[in-house]
Every structure is written in C-alpha cells, then in structure tokens.
C-alpha cells in the first residue's frame, strides 16, 4: 500500500501506517461474521429459537455491551492519554475480543446466557479497540491527509472482512461435504476463522505502530482513575460550548450511527425474515457488499480531501436514505441487492468521514479523550438504534419492513444537523481551545477546509 509522505506526519514511516491500517483489516471480520452476516441470525433463529422476542433480545444484548462501553470508555480514554497506554490497551482489547469470539463456538440451542455473555465481552472489546486505534490517527496523519489515511484504514478494513467472509463462505459451502459439518458446526467454523484471522492480522499493528504520547507526570493511578475520568468527561462536555461544531458533529455521528448500527447488527436478520435468505446467501451478500464498501471507503477518502469532509458525509447520508427506501420496498432479490450495495458504499465512507472530522474539530493534545467522547456517543447510538428496531418488530408482530423504514428517520435527522456544521469555524474553535489551555500542537501547514 502506497502512502504519500505529504499525507503523513514527520517521522511516520509508511510501514507504521500499514500497521495501523492492519488493525482495521484484522477486526473487520468480527463485525461482518458475528454482528452482520452469520451469528446474529444464528442467535435469533437457533439460540433463541426464533421466538417472537428473539430479535428484541438480540438488540438488548448489543445495547448492554454498548452501555457498558459508555461507562468504561471514559476511564480507558483518560488512562490512554494520561499514561500513554493506547497501544497496551489496544493489545488487551484485541485478546479479549478474540477469546470471546472463540467462546461463541460453544453456543447452541438454548444457550442464551452464555451467548449473551460472549457477545457482550467481544463487542465491548471490539469497540474499545476501535476507539484506541482511531486515537492514533492524529499522530500519524498530516492535517491535509487525514481523510486519505482514514479512508485507507477503512478500505483496508473491508478487505479484511472480505478475507474472513471468503474463507467462511468456502467453509459453509464445502464443509458439509468434505468434513460432514452440520449447520451448527458450520457456524462454529466461521467463528474460528474470524478469531484466527483477527489474531494473525494484528501482528503488523503491534510490531510497527508506535506509542508517541508521553505519560503526564501527574497521571492518575488505578484508585483515582474512575473519578478522574468522570471529571475528564465532565471537562470534555463543559468544553462543548467552546467547541460547538464538534458538538454538532457528535450529534450528527450519533444519529448516523443509530441507523448504521441497525444495518450492521440486523441486516442478516432482515434478509432471512423478509427475503428468505439462507446462511450461504447471507455470507455471499455481505461478502459482495464488503467489496462495495472497500471501494467506497477508499474512494471517498480522496473525495473528502477534494470536496471536504462535510460534503462527503452529507452525500453518504443521502445514500443511506436511498438505501432505506429501496430496502423497505424490495419485493425481489435484485432490488434488495441494490439496497445492500448502496449500504456498502455508504458504510465505509460515512464512518471514515466521521473519524476524519473528529481529528479536525477536536484538540489534538487530548485526542484519545475526545475520541472517547465521540465513541461514547456512537455507543449510545448502538443502544438506541437496534433497540428501536427490535421494539418495532416486537410491537408490530415482526414487521421488519416497518422497522427498517423507521430507521431511515435517523439518517434524515442527521442531515438536518449536519447542515448547521461549519468546518472552518470548527477548526478555528479547536485551535483556539488548544491555545487557551496551553496545549498547542507542533506547527503544521494550513488546512484547506470546505
């Protein structure tokens, strides 16, 4: 992968950026297999026995893991900033996510409690790892190239999802004939593949990605960490009046993620319930959508730096709206595949744009803290979005079309909020805030913003 020097900060080697992007490659298999293509539908239809409350229960489990993340992430964000422990925290989160993914191989019909525990642990660890890895972005990317580098990470991540899904598709297609695997065995096999790919692909991350932060002399210890992190979170929130455009971005990200989280966690459930998809169909669908997503994330990374992050994000939000309309009205497989590929284009590009915009609108010296705040908002969205979908299916007698249509309201609301965001003014707010509190970053070239 080629990384132009102009897109990187001084002293950052291309292989370090490759190591950073390798983590996106590694962990994408978890979301595609566990949350999107395989295990979510397996939980609803097998573990929970396709009960009327099964979809709602799945969304509750996802909500619980997100709620825990909202509580612990401020602690982890403060720890990462104060003790310069982003890299160590990233390693621990990786190990926990892989171990819990392997734990899911022990689930089956009726094992609701164990499955719920493993999902909560793995999803929590995944989100923590995603947050800590994102916090490295301002350290390795130049201000002019942050969109490109973020896009590289997302596109490389979708390539990782393709590798994991491709191997999983081969297993479920040929496994029954070659090794006599039944349905449960095929699902377990995809989980083993996911964990192994995750472990192997993170080797470049921990070999090459550097911790550039310096521990603060007055860094809090474990006993005082929670109270200090709560104070830090309060301080972050209290800074929002001075960083109003970061606040608007956070609200936009929350509304966008409400819809995105539904697509991630319930797409296979929707495809199975409404379109009659099999396990092979679902994996193939997500596999091809990941190709679209990789192209979208990579291409939009360059589009962002050409037309600006805000316009890029606005474009992807309208693509999400179009996807919802097509999916909710799909009567045939072709129409549904069109909706799925629209989701793929929007998925990587909207998340890449949001991550890049945080780097522009937040104080660089407190990057992990503000990324933690940003991700806390996204985790809250991971509660609200899926729970809304699950509640609608429950009260409407499993009307998944109605549930996906209501999901579209989140994207429309995000568009309304995004219209009020000004990137130039927001950038000035961030730099003025750094100067006011005495945390000025090293001199950089002027940033061209929309």
Where are the regions a protein language model picked out?
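Multi-pass alpha-helical transporter architecture, strongest
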Residues: 2, 197-208, 405-443, 448-449
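Juxtamembrane intracellular "pre-TM" segments in multi-pass secondary transporters
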Residues: 2-17, 210-251, 436-450
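Short amphipathic helix-loop junctions that connect adjacent transmembrane helices
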Residues: 32-55, 265-282
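A membrane-interface helix-boundary motif in multi-pass transporters
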Residues: 51-53, 172-196, 391-411
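Helix-to-loop junctions at the C-terminal end of transmembrane segments
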Residues: 71-85, 295-309, 393
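Structural signature of the two symmetry-related core transmembrane helices
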Residues: 88-103, 311-326
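Hydrophobic core of transmembrane alpha-helices in multi-pass small-molecule transporters
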Residues: 100, 111-129, 335-349
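Glycine-rich segments within core transmembrane alpha-helices of 12-TM secondary carriers
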Residues: 151-172, 375-386
């Amino acid at each position: 992968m080629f990384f132009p020097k102009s897109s990187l900060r001084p002293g950052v080697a291309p292989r370090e950026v490759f190591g950073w992007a390798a983590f996106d490659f590694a962990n994408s298999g978890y979301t595609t297999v566990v949350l999107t293509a395989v295990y979510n539908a397996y939980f609803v239809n097998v573990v929970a026995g396709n009960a009327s409350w099964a979809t709602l229960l799945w969304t509750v489990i996802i909500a619980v893991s997100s709620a825990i993340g909202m509580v612990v992430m401020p602690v982890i964000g403060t720890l990462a900033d104060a003790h310069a422990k982003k890299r160590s925290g990233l390693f621990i989160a990786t190990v926990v996510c892989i171990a819990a993914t392997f734990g899911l191989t022990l689930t089956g019909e009726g094992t609701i409690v164990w499955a719920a525990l493993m999902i909560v642990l793995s999803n929590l660890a995944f989100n923590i790892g995603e947050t800590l890895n994102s916090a490295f972005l301002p350290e390795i990317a130049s201000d002019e190239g942050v969109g490109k580098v973020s896009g590289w990470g997302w596109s490389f991540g979708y390539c990782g999802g393709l590798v994991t899904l491709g191997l999983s598709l081969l297993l479920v297609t040929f496994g029954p004939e070659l090794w006599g695997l039944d349905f449960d065995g095929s699902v377990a096999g995809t989980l083993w593949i996911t964990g192994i790919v995750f472990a192997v692909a993170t080797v470049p991350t921990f070999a090459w990605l550097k911790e550039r932060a310096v521990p603060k002399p007055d860094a809090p210890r474990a006993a005082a960490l929670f109270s200090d992190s709560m104070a830090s979170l309060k301080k972050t929130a209290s800074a929002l009046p001075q960083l109003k455009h970061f606040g608007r971005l956070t609200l936009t990200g929350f509304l966008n993620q409400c819809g995105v989280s539904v697509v991630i966690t319930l797409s296979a459930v929707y495809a199975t319930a409404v379109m009659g998809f099999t396990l092979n169909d679902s994996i193939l669908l997500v596999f091809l959508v990941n190709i679209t997503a990789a192209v979208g994330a990579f291409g939009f990374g360059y589009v962002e730096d050409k037309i600006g992050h805000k316009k890029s994000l606005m474009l992807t939000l309208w693509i999400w709206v179009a996807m919802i309309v097509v999916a909710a009205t799909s009567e045939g497989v072709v129409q549904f595949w069109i909706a799925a590929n629209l989701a793929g284009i929007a998925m990587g590009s909207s998340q890449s744009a949001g991550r890049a915009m945080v780097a522009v609108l937040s104080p660089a010296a407190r990057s992990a803290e503000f990324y933690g705040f940003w991700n806390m908002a996204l985790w809250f969205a991971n509660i609200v979005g899926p729970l809304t979908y699950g509640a609608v299916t429950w009260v409407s007698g499993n009307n998944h079309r109605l549930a996906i249509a209501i999901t579209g309201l989140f994207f429309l609301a995000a568009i309304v909020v995004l219209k009020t965001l000004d990137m130039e003014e927001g950038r000035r707010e961030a730099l003025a805030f750094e100067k006011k509190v005495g945390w000025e970053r090293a001199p950089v070239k002027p940033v061209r913003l929309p």
